[in-house]
């Protein structure tokens, strides 16, 4: 019975990810989530309490996926501080390529002025591990004389995230306006190098 309950919760969450990614919080329908999950609406409210709480669980799930990538990077030992920066850029891009729903959900939440994120205190700590890792990396870079003293760790994290995220959040409009193909590997590689070199330039002593 417990196994079935966990399976149902998982099916609901997966269906909710797709529905909220496609329609945002306001446009998403619990009926559609229930149909896609193969359950009734009552089970959604039983397991998640409300549409709002289900939406928060979806955001938490998406952030947890990214956090697992960050945790793997944090666990690795980089002898060169700049190598970590390059590795994070590469993994962020890889993650966003594989998880288009993440981009859509975060875009919707930004349009919603981060109401769900602000209402749940647990989200405040979601970036703490990677910020601390970058802070230590910047400090180590200063100690060996390759990073400047004024470098701000949060600025670096912001640049890492937005440098990758903007590539995918603009993937429909900018290709039309600039006549470019964002799926071309050479274009993707060039953009990643711009992000990496820009952050390295900011950090350079």
Locations of the language-model features?
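N-terminal intrinsically disordered/low-complexity leader segments
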Residues: 1-7
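Helix-turn-helix
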Residues: 11, 15, 19-53, 57-58
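Short, basic, alpha-helical segments at the C-terminal edge of helix-turn-helix-like DNA-binding modules
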Residues: 60-65
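Hydrophobic alpha-helical connector segments
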Residues: 72-102, 153-160, 205
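Amphipathic alpha-helical segments used for helix-helix packing
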Residues: 97-118, 170-178
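All-alpha amphipathic helical-bundle segments outside canonical DNA-binding/catalytic cores
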Residues: 122-126, 143-159
């Amino acid at each position: 019975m417990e196994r079935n309950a966990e399976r149902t919760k998982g099916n609901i969450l997966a269906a909710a990810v797709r529905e909220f990614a496609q329609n945002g919080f306001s446009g998403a329908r619990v009926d559609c989530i229930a149909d896609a999950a193969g359950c009734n609406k009552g089970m959604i409210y039983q397991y998640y309490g409300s549409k709002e709480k289900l939406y928060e669980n979806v955001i938490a799930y998406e952030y947890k996926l990214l956090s697992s990538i960050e945790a793997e990077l944090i666990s690795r030992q980089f002898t060169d501080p700049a190598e970590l920066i390059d590795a994070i850029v590469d993994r962020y891009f890889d993650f966003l390529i594989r998880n288009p729903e993440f981009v859509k959900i975060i875009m919707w939440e930004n349009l919603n002025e981060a109401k769900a994120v602000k209402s749940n205190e647990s989200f405040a700590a979601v970036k703490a591990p990677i910020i601390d890792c970058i802070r230590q990396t910047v400090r180590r870079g200063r100690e060996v004389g390759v990073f400047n003293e004024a470098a701000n760790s949060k600025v670096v994290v912001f640049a890492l995230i937005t440098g990758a995220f903007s590539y995918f959040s603009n993937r429909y409009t900018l290709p039309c306006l600039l006549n470019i193909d964002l799926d071309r590997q050479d274009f993707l590689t060039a953009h990643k190098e711009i992000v990496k070199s820009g952050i390295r330039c900011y950090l350079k002593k």
